[in-house]
UniProtKB/Swiss-Prot annotation:
The gene is petJ. The lineage of its organism: Bacteria, Bacillati, Cyanobacteriota, Cyanophyceae, Oscillatoriophycideae. Heme c binds at C14, C17, H18, M62. Keywords: Electron transport, Heme, Iron, Metal-binding, Photosynthesis, Thylakoid, Transport. This is Cytochrome c6. Functions as an electron carrier between membrane-bound cytochrome b6-f and photosystem I in oxygenic photosynthesis. GO terms for molecular function: electron transfer activity; heme binding; iron ion binding. The keyword Nucleotide-binding does not apply. Binds 1 heme c group covalently per subunit.
Length: 89
């Protein structure tokens, strides 16, 4: 995915709950690398695919963005989230 494009998708669609890699709904489930690895199935094998799956389908309080974002936008925002998690937000 395109990390720069993903940054703008994140800003428009995700930042309300996940600004700076945080989670305003469930504080202990952040977008840190360790939390993503703990809560997302398959993160250690393919981090971008695991984040893209979560964004597409949602889970618990998080809505799915399938139909609201294109597959490319989802791939891009997943690449951005993983990139930021690697950098420690």
């Amino acid at each position: 995915g395109d990390v720069a494009a993903g940054a703008s998708v994140f800003s428009a669609n995700c930042a309300a709950c996940h600004m700076g890699g945080r989670n305003v709904i469930v504080a202990n489930k952040t977008l840190s690398k360790s939390d993503l690895a703990k809560y997302l199935k398959g993160f250690d094998d393919d981090a971008v695919a695991a984040v893209a799956y979560q964004v597409t389908n949602g889970k618990n309080a998080m809505p799915g963005f399938n139909g609201r974002l294109s597959p490319k936008q989802i791939e891009d925002v997943a690449a951005y989230v993983v990139d930021q998690a690697e950098k420690g937000w």
